[in-house]
Structure formats: C-alpha cells, structure tokens
Regions:
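Short edge beta-strand/loop segments characteristic of extracellular beta-sandwich folds
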Residues: 244-252
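Short, compositionally biased P/S/T/A/G/V-rich stretches that sit at domain boundaries
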Residues: 203, 207-243
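Active-site segments of SGNH/GDSL-like serine hydrolases
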Residues: 26, 102-118
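Short, well-ordered beta-to-alpha junction loops that form the rim of enzyme active sites
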Residues: 68, 107-111, 146-147, 217-219
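Extended active-site neighborhood of metal-dependent phosphoesterases/phosphodiesterases
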Residues: 2-100, 119-143, 149-208, 212-215
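Beta-strand-rich binding/interaction modules
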Residues: 245, 256-261
C-alpha cells in the first residue's frame, strides 16, 4: 500500500472476492511511521489483518509467517531485517513439535540474505539463531520479497546454514514490478518491469508429495511466458556476426541450464 495504511481495508475487500485463504505478511510499507517504538509499529496492520507472526498447518506442509521488519524510529533507513525475542520463543515452541519430515515454508518480507554491500540489511545474529532452529528439518523454503527483483538462494555455510536439509530462499518479485514505472501502454498502464527485467506479476507455489514447484505469471502477458528473448530484429546478409542473443529466464537459478538453437540446428549453451 506504499505507506498509505488507509488502503488496508480495501486490500482485504478485494482479496475476499477471490474466495481463498490469505496469509498476510507485514512489510516495511505497512509500518505506522508515527509509532514511538517497534512494539507498536504494526497496530494498524494488526487491526485489519490479525497477528503478524503465526503458524498455519496443511497436510502437505507447515507454514510460518514472520514480521521481520524491525522498526528503528529516527534512523535512516527506519528499519532493518531481523527477529525479536518473542518471535524466537514462538519459533522454538512451535518448531519443537512440528513434523520434521514435512516441507516447512517460512514467509517474511525482508530477505534473509544480505542485499547490500554497504550495510547489514538483515541482522546476522538473528539469522544464525533462526537457522539453528531449522537444522532438524529436511526441507525448508523461505519466501521473501522487498527487493522488487527475483532471485533464488541456496543457503549454505557462507550464509550461516549448516544443516543437512535443503534450505532454499525464493526472493519473489512484486505485483507492482518496478514500482509502476516505465513507458505506459495504450491503456495508461506502465511497463513496470523490475530491475532484473522480470515483468510485474505473481508467483505460484504448488506442493505435491515431497516436492514443490514455483512458477512466475506475468500480469499482462501470455500466462506461460517463462522468459524474454532479446535479439536483433534484422541482420544484413554477409555482415560480421557480432550480435548477441539474450534470454531473461524469469525463474532461473544460478545453476539453470539455458540453451539456444537456430531453426533445427544444434543446441548451444548460453
């Protein structure tokens, strides 16, 4: 809602029309910036959506929602990613009894990995404590947002993960994309592509058995469009072949294999 907390009620009204359960995650634009301290910084959010930290169980997976935006009144920026002592007590109590063989999905707003080289964006000590609590679990999916880009992080020793299970963080793109910026179309809607070229839209998590699948859906493009291709539209015959073809695969990981071929030719790695 971009700091306009009066829109919370309208968001609920629109979401209700979709007739599906919603688990709301608080973000930095949901803060009461006139609050005197962190403890009271989500009073408006809680009044509309309920608790900011809770667990939700399904037969396929267990879900935990965390408010990881620590409000720092008077500072710039006025928040940092992290967790509070009360949240750690909740996590310790809940995770002790949760089924360790089921997928555990943790949703928060600020990414658990560091997004800036200039400063700490998520408190490292809090991440270390959280990851210690997650060690007994076989499969953990972290869902984060905030960056208005998309990325996948496989946590390991470099990011304080020392468990035997898989710890995958998906930093999801935004419905508003690049803050509703860019050239407007005939209907007046901005291009809204994010910094990494991903179009605005939404992600879908599908859980089946012991595995899950993540897909990105463009808000206004073909529903199955998984990438954008960038190549010259016209090539002069006999010209020096100094051109490039770029593929922006919206849900790619660092180890994703992307190949290209021309007509019925051989596939070549990109």
């Amino acid at each position: 809602v971009h700091d306009d907390l009066s829109l919370h009620a309208e968001v609920k009204k629109i979401d209700k029309a979709l007739d599906t359960p919603w688990l709301y995650v608080a973000g930095n634009h949901d803060i009461d910036f006139d609050a005197p301290d962190d403890a009271s910084s989500l009073e408006s959010f809680r009044a509309q959506f309920g608790p900011d930290t809770f667990a939700w169980e399904e037969h396929t997976a267990n879900f935990v929602v965390l408010d990881d935006v620590i409000y720092l009144p008077g500072e710039k920026p006025a928040y940092i990613g992290g967790l509070r002592e009360a949240q750690f007590r909740f996590l310790q109590s809940y995770l002790e009894t949760a089924d360790k063989s089921k997928l555990l999905v943790i949703s928060a707003h600020i990414p658990f990995f560091q997004t800036s080289m200039a400063r700490e964006t998520f408190r490292s000590a809090d991440r270390l404590r959280l990851f210690e609590l997650l060690k007994p679990f076989r499969d953990i999916l972290l869902l984060s947002a905030h960056s208005h880009t998309q990325s996948h992080v496989r946590h390991g020793p470099a990011t304080d993960w020392h468990g035997a299970g898989r710890l995958h963080e998906y930093n999801a793109g935004a419905a508003c994309g690049g803050y509703w910026s860019g050239i407007k179309d005939a209907e007046g809607i901005p291009d809204a592509a994010m910094e990494d070229g991903t179009p605005n839209g939404y992600a879908r998590l599908a859980i089946k058995g012991d595995d899950y699948r993540l897909n990105w859906f463009n808000a206004r493009q073909q529903p199955n469009q998984a990438m954008a291709l960038h190549a010259p539209k016209v090539l002069r015959q006999g010209a020096y072949p100094g051109f490039a073809v770029f593929a922006n695969v919206f849900m790619a990981r660092h180890d994703t294999v992307v190949e290209v071929r021309i007509d019925a030719g051989d596939w070549h790695p990109m």
